[in-house]
Regions:
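Core alpha/beta nucleotide-donor-binding catalytic domains of modification enzymes
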Residues: 2-23, 27-175
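A short, hydrophobic C-terminal helix/tail in secreted or cell-surface proteins
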Residues: 176-180
Length: 180
């Protein structure tokens, strides 16, 4: 499993290029940052603060992951209000991340196979035309999604096998329900 995950992540990356990983503190970006950091010194990470209920915990984890990997890391504000919609947070995140990129850098995000399938069905339910059903593109000139063919379960297993620390998003939402 380990070698397959690593091969899938690095197969479309040119290790001579400069990369910025969108580091959320979750398993997807933690595994992505860990594998890419082992392959190239040309990596830094960015965390986007969304000012949501658990942003501080996610930011702490992202900082810890970057520190453990010894990569440059920066946290940036989105200026969103608490309880902003997923769409607003996503749009703000991409705007901030693209603004942060230098001309010679490529953004890496932790979108997985699960995200790809979810996006496909959301687009289908919206009545998107055939072109829109392609779901999430794996590569654009300034963006790579190396985890797009990997399931979240496989990433969780990889993280456990390799002692990669991350914050489980499900635990945050579960604790929300317990708080209410």
């Amino acid at each position: 499993m380990t070698n397959k995950i690593e091969k899938d992540i690095i197969k479309n990356l040119d290790t001579s290029k400069n990369y910025v990983v969108a580091l959320s503190g979750g398993v997807d970006s933690a595994v992505l940052a860990t594998v890419v950091a082992q392959q190239t010194p040309n990596l830094r990470s960015v965390f986007v603060r969304h000012n949501q209920k658990h942003s501080d915990k996610l930011e702490e984890m992202a900082n810890r992951i970057a520190d453990n990997l010894k990569i440059n890391h920066k946290a940036l504000d989105s200026n969103l209000k608490e309880n902003s919609s997923e769409t607003k947070m996503r749009d703000a995140r991409y705007e901030i991340l693209y603004d942060e990129l230098n001309d010679d850098e490529i953004l890496l995000t932790g979108h997985t196979l699960s995200d790809k399938v979810e996006t496909f069905f959301i687009n289908l339910l919206r009545g998107t035309r055939v072109r829109g059903l392609k779901s999430i593109p794996k590569m654009t000139p300034r963006l790579r999604r190396p985890l797009l063919e990997i399931s979240k379960d496989n990433l969780i297993n990889y993280a456990k096998e390799n002692n990669i620390e991350y914050l489980d998003d499900c635990l945050l939402y579960t604790s929300d329900a317990a708080d209410e």
